UniProtKB/Swiss-Prot annotation:
EC number in record: 5.4.99.25
Name of the protein this chain belongs to: tRNA pseudouridine synthase B
NCBIfam families named in the record: TruB
A GO MF label: RNA binding
Pfam families per the UniProt record, alphabetical: TruB_C, TruB_C_2, TruB_N
Superkingdom classification of source: Bacteria
Species name: Mycobacterium tuberculosis (strain ATCC 25618 / H37Rv)
Gene this chain is encoded by: truB
């Protein structure tokens, strides 16, 4: 077991590594197999990758569903096979005629509640197989549109490159948003095609880039960014339990509801998070028991 105990590490993922590669490095650094991540980043992408160590892997599913923020560069005028710079160029259409006003107007139509067809090279399963594996085999992949929310899609800068235009953008979005698909849809809306040439994730829920550490720094000075208790109390509202309630929660039993919206952290008298709960009607439902009654005290 890791000597550091359970908790969260916020990594600034470098380009060229898969999210699974980062998990592998963290397993070696923390000397434990119980390591996972909250939300895949493509190999070309950099930025915030939240890693769970030991029992903190139990909360990663909740983090995966958290809103996210990105900084990206989109190239208008080219369509690629992967919707990013790693794929083959399938089509080039002159984009030099596009004005900033036209680009921003197209971006405006992609803000708010929309339906998005995920990237064909996403990790979504189609017939039990990952879409990206099928796409790379040259097979047609049909994915259903999904509801997402784009809270911010802001144009920061534009650079003209012969017949192409590169734009720098920042995006705040719901979980399940594919930035490659957003670039594709923007290019399609403008009639010239588009793909992502650079992508950096700057936020996952309450975890931001200024909290992130490089893997090299982590290897030199292994330490959690936050303990499991600290991470839970940062992410969720708090409910203090009596001793009897704490015992019940540790055994997975329901408690009387208290009217807190969403998932919340239920703490014992020492401030330790016993479980994550959700009110459903007049009772609670256990989302995750983090300190089960069978666990050694601590």
């Amino acid at each position: 077991m890791s000597a550091t105990g359970p908790g969260i590490v916020v990594i600034d993922k470098p380009a060229g590594m898969t999210s699974h590669d980062v998990v592998g490095r963290c397993r070696r650094i923390f000397a434990t197999r119980r390591v996972g991540h909250a939300g895949t980043l493509d190999p070309m992408a950099t930025g915030v990758l939240v890693i769970g160590i030991e029992r903190a892997t139990k909360i990663l599913g909740l983090l995966t569903a958290a809103p996210k923020s990105y900084a990206a560069t989109i190239r208008l005028g080219q369509t690629t096979s992967t919707e990013d710079a790693e794929g083959q160029v399938l089509q080039s259409v002159p984009a030099k005629h596009l004005t900033i006003e036209a680009i921003d107007a197209a971006m405006e139509r992609l803000r708010g509640e929309i339906r998005q067809v995920p990237s064909s090279v996403s990790a979504i399963k189609v017939g039990g197989r990952r879409a990206y594996r099928l796409a790379r085999q040259g097979r047609s992949v049909q994915l259903e549109a999904r509801p997402i929310r784009i809270d911010r899609f802001e144009l920061l800068a534009a650079r003209r490159r012969d017949q192409l235009i590169d734009i720098d953008v920042e995006i705040d979005c719901s979980s399940g948003t594919y930035i490659r698909a957003l670039a594709r849809d923007l290019g399609d809306a403008l009639g010239v095609g588009g793909h992502v040439t650079a992508l950096r994730r700057t936020r996952v829920g309450r975890f931001e880039l200024d909290q992130a550490r490089s893997l090299d720094d982590l290897a030199e000075r292994p330490a959690l960014s936050l303990s499991l208790d600290e991470a839970c109390l940062l992410m969720f509202a708090r409910r203090d339990l009596t001793a009897a309630e704490a015992s019940a929660a540790a055994n997975g039993r329901s408690l009387p509801a208290v009217g807190i919206d969403g998932v919340y952290a239920a703490c014992d008298a020492d401030g330790r998070v016993i479980a994550l709960l959700r009110d459903e009607g007049s009772r609670t439902r256990s989302v995750a028991v983090l300190r089960p009654a069978t666990m050694h005290p601590g």
